[in-house]
C-alpha cells in the first residue's frame, strides 16, 4: 500500500513530525516521520514502533504500517481530529462529558499498565480525540516496558517529560519510576479538565481529593494502581450525576426550600443543575436560596 503525505499537523514534535496523509485508495491517516538521524533517536523511534505495534486497545493509538529501517523512517496511524487540548475548554462544568472523556483516558491507561507499559509522557497533547467516546493515548516514544530485559535507552539520571505533568521522582530520574508516575500525570490532566486549565476552582472536595491523591509528592501515597484510581473516579462522578431527572431536581429543590440541605449539598446541587437542568429549574433553585447561601455560592 502506498501513502501520500499532505499537510503537517500541529506543532513540531521532539524527534518526529506528524502529517496528514492518504492511501492510494483515498483513506485518510496520519503519518509520524522521524526527523533526525541521531542514533539514540532512531533507536527510541524503533522501540516506540515495536512496543506500540503489539498493543491492541481502542484507547491506545495503533500502528497501521511502518518502516523503521529505511532512509525515511515513519509509521502510519489513524487520523484523529485533534488532541484533548482543544476539547478541554468545552468540558468545563459538563460532568457527563468530563466523565466520558476521563473514562476513555483511564481505560487506555489501565490497559497500558496491565500490559506492563509505563507511558512517562502523559499529557493532554498526547491524548487524541475524535469524540467523547473515541479517544486514544498516543506518543509512546518515552514509554518503557516494566521489568523488561530489552534495550533500555534511558540512562540513570536522565530526565524527560513535560514540566507540569512530570512526577517529582521522574524529575529526579526518569528510569527509576513505576506506574505511579503516570498516575501523577493523570491527576494533573484531571485538574486541567475540571478547571479549564486552572482558570476556575476545582468543583468539589471529592474531585479535589482525587487530584491531591494522584499528585501527592510521595509516590507511595498515590493510588495503588490506575484501576483503583478509576474505581474512585467512577464513584465520585456517578454520585455527581445522580440528579438528572426532573423528579430528582424537584425533590432536591423542595429539600432546599425546607432548609434540609447543608452547604456542601447545595454546592453540589448547583453544579449538577448547571450541567443538566433546564432554565426554570435553575431559576427555582436560586429562588430557594437564603441570602447567606446565595452569597456563599457567589463567593465560591
Per-region residue spans from a language model:
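Activation segment signature within eukaryotic-like protein kinase domains
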Residues: 101-102
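Catalytic-loop of the protein kinase fold
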Residues: 113-130
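Conserved activation segment of eukaryotic-like protein kinases, specifically the C-terminal portion
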Residues: 153-170
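Short beta-strand micro-motifs within the conserved protein kinase catalytic domain, predominantly
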Residues: 62-73
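Regulatory extensions appended to serine/threonine kinase catalytic cores
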Residues: 241-300
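AlphaC helix of the protein kinase catalytic domain
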Residues: 84-94
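AlphaC helix of the eukaryotic protein kinase fold
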Residues: 35, 39-54
